[in-house]
Curated annotation (Swiss-Prot):
Gene Ontology MF: a single term: metal ion binding
Name the UniProt record assigns to this protein: Putative ribonucleoside-diphosphate reductase small subunit 067L
Cofactor binding summary note: Binds 2 iron ions per subunit.
Ligand binding (Fe cation 1): D131, E162, H165
Keywords: Deoxyribonucleotide synthesis, Iron, Metal-binding, Oxidoreductase
Organism: Frog virus 3 (isolate Goorha) (FV-3)
Record field: catalytic activity: a 2'-deoxyribonucleoside 5'-diphosphate + [thioredoxin]-disulfide + H2O = a ribonucleoside 5'-diphosphate + [thioredoxin]-dithiol
Length: 387
């Protein structure tokens, strides 16, 4: 994972000896060049990927390696990863907590128009598979690279929740009476397969590739899924498909935590390897952001093509929301604007809560998961009853 390092050493330079030893111990490929009198700068002169890197930067990166297997459970090297994992588990839920009785009534009684049914079917056709791909990203790519135990625990916790998301949206499909063939129907739509192809394009074999993959992971979970969330939640505002809305609310809360964890992972990578995110890489980030915007616009057009505006939601609003969220997610990763034409304010005011992941459950009408398991601390004292 660590890129090839070229160092120019100087006779009698203690730091040169220390760096060469560290590179050898970490099995980092490196080339040692002979001293050339008259070359300015402090020694060793190190270059990584064609960029000159200071001695302190490179030794810090070697010491804070996220890619080395932990020798023991504690001490944690990355406390934030354990904190996020704990927060994630405290809002655990399972698909059996969802009540879809009213959704079936809405679907079969005529409350949902044929156009609205087509709209929901289009989104659900892809949604389960999207969560399959997100789970695969964690298990097949990120956990194969990050060997630090607390980071892996966070990532596997995220992957396990994606399995629950898959089951929840599958339960919705099955309860509404959609046949199993609907799970493969996405393959007939280029607007859907193109989105999935983009999600699968991950290269974690190099540090720049890993940084780009982390950005893509945030775009996948923090942008693409949220566009679909908006389209499904619009029915909840009209009192329709409330069970589906609850699945979305709980998924939103999870995905926000996932985005938080992956964004922090990106920031940590950038902090430990500050030479990785270059101007050229940021240009690639912008290309990825534009590609996501293009893919989402095509999918939005597909979803709306049979029904036009749904419950007051216009296609352009969703497209603008995608652009807005792309820049918002980028800012939270410490990156500049990736799309200049994006609106500065949220174009759909009623979905501002999505980014916070708040749960809007009515306590008296539904199960509640807006709680923290084990959240109470301190001691409990009471007087014995005089019976």
């Amino acid at each position: 994972m660590f890129p090839h390092v070229t160092i120019v050493e100087k006779p009698g330079c203690g730091n040169c000896v220390t760096l060469k030893r560290a590179l050898k111990e970490k099995s980092v490929p490196h080339t040692v060049m002979p001293y050339v009198p008259g070359v300015p700068g402090s020694y060793p002169i190190a270059t990584v990927g064609g960029q000159r890197v200071g001695y302190r930067e490179i030794t810090k990166a070697l010491a804070m390696d996220m890619f080395t297997t932990s020798k023991c459970f504690k001490p944690f090297r990355y406390n934030w990863a354990e904190d996020i994992r704990t927060k994630h588990e405290k809002v655990h839920w399972v698909e059996t907590e969802i009540n879809l009785r009213d959704d079936v009534t809405d679907w079969k009684s005529g409350v949902m128009t044929p156009g609205e049914k087509a709209f929901v079917s289009c989104v659900l056709r892809l949604f389960t598979q999207l969560d399959v791909e997100v789970g695969a990203l964690y298990l097949d790519h990120l956990t194969q690279v990050f060997r630090c135990n607390e980071i892996r625990n966070m990532l596997t916790s995220f992957a396990c929740r994606e399995a629950i998301h898959q089951k929840a949206y599958s339960l919705l499909n099955d309860t509404l009476g959609m046949p199993d063939c609907e799970y493969q129907a996405f393959a007939d739509y280029g607007e859907m397969t193109d989105k999935l192809d983009f999600m699968r394009e991950m290269d974690c074999s190099t540090l720049p590739g890993l940084a780009r993959s982390l950005l893509r992971a945030v775009l996948n979970e923090g942008v693409s899924l949220f566009a679909a969330f908006v389209m499904l939640l619009t029915f909840q505002r009209s009192g329709k498909m409330k069970g589906m809305g609850k699945v979305v609310e709980w998924s939103v809360r999870d995905e926000n935590i996932h985005v938080e964890g992956v964004s922090k992972l990106f920031e940590t990578l950038n902090s430990e390897y500050p030479w990785v995110v270059t101007k050229d890489l940021i240009e690639l980030f912008k290309e990825d952001a534009e590609r996501v915007a293009e893919l989402e616009e095509a999918f939005v057009d597909l979803a709306f093509q049979e029904c036009g505006p749904v419950c007051g939601l216009e296609p352009k609003q969703v497209k603008d929301y995608v652009l807005y969220v792309i820049n918002l997610r980028a800012a939270n990763m410490g990156l500049p604007k990736l799309i200049e034409r994006a609106p500065e304010a949220c174009p759909i005011p009623w979905v501002k809560w999505l980014i916070d992941g708040a749960d809007l459950t009515n306590f008296f009408e539904n199960h509640v998961t807006e709680y923290e398991t084990g959240g109470l601390t301190g001691s409990w004292s009471y007087e014995p009853l005089d019976i």
